[in-house]
């Protein structure tokens, strides 16, 4: 559990560094609350945390959203680096995982016909051109333009951080904490503690992609992905299911407790007068 908390603390420190405004306590509580919110409505937490900082510290909402998007891009790059490292280190395991789950890039792309690709591409271009014309040419959308400028400022604010090295350090610390949180759970069971540390890394990486499925805290896809990886390393299906259920329940409990703490803390926090 401690590493699960430190991951969110480092995330708050990184967001504070990017925003250069707002109280750290408000930012941290907004992040705690965002994960709890996503348990109820998947992916709602990102908007909620922006709303919390907007309400309590008066920051521009569009800029907050832009900064969150830029943060998530950085997180995705971190996941891709972890994935590349794990794949290069454990290529045979990933091949067996794809075979066992029936996943492959070819099987996904084969579902699209040439006509389907053309229709999708042309529709996307048409929608984009229409939206740009409305936003930049029609006076009725002047307020939208202002919000887009705020969003753009938030999106590029990562490039303007005062300490890029500290930003990188926080980003590494976030994902190291996530991994250590997962690795500690590995040591709690005889059947996972006895397998190689490579298994923990592969299961962690695969789990990162499983939680992208819009279910509460990745419930379902995450269990299946982690259990499947454990089975590839010789853990029985029953033991793998027990491990996945235990870790996911622990994570969910932590998210709920931190969310309740954030609600209590924010109720005692003064709103800045704007």
Identify the residue ranges that each predicted region occupies.
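Helix-loop junctions and terminal segments of transmembrane helices
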Residues: 12, 16, 47-52
């Amino acid at each position: 559990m401690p590493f699960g908390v430190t991951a969110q603390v480092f995330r708050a420190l990184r967001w504070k560094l990017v925003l250069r405004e707002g109280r750290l306590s408000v930012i941290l509580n907004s992040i705690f609350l965002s994960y709890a919110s996503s348990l109820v409505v998947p992916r709602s937490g990102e908007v909620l945390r922006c709303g919390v900082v907007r309400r309590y510290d008066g920051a521009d909402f569009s800029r907050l959203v832009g900064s969150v998007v830029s943060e998530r891009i950085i997180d995705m790059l971190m996941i891709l680096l972890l994935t590349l490292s794990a794949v290069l280190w454990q290529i045979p395991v990933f091949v067996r995982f794809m075979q066992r789950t029936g996943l492959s890039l070819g099987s996904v792309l084969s579902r699209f016909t040439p006509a389907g690709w053309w229709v999708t591409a042309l529709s996307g271009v048409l929608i984009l051109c229409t939206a740009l014309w409305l936003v930049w040419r029609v006076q009725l959308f002047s307020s939208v333009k202002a919000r887009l400028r705020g969003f753009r400022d938030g999106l590029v604010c990562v490039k303007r951080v005062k300490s890029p090295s500290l930003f990188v350090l926080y980003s590494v610390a976030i994902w190291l904490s996530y991994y250590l949180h997962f690795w500690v759970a590995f040591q709690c069971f005889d059947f996972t503690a006895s397998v190689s540390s490579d298994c923990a890394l592969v299961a962690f990486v695969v789990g990162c992609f499983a939680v992208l499925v819009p279910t509460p805290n990745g419930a379902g896809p995450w269990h299946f992905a982690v259990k499947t990886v454990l089975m590839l390393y010789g853990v029985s299906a029953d033991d793998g299911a027990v491990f996945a259920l235990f870790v996911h329940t622990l994570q969910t409990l932590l998210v709920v407790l931190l969310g309740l703490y954030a609600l209590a803390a924010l109720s005692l926090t003064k709103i800045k007068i704007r």
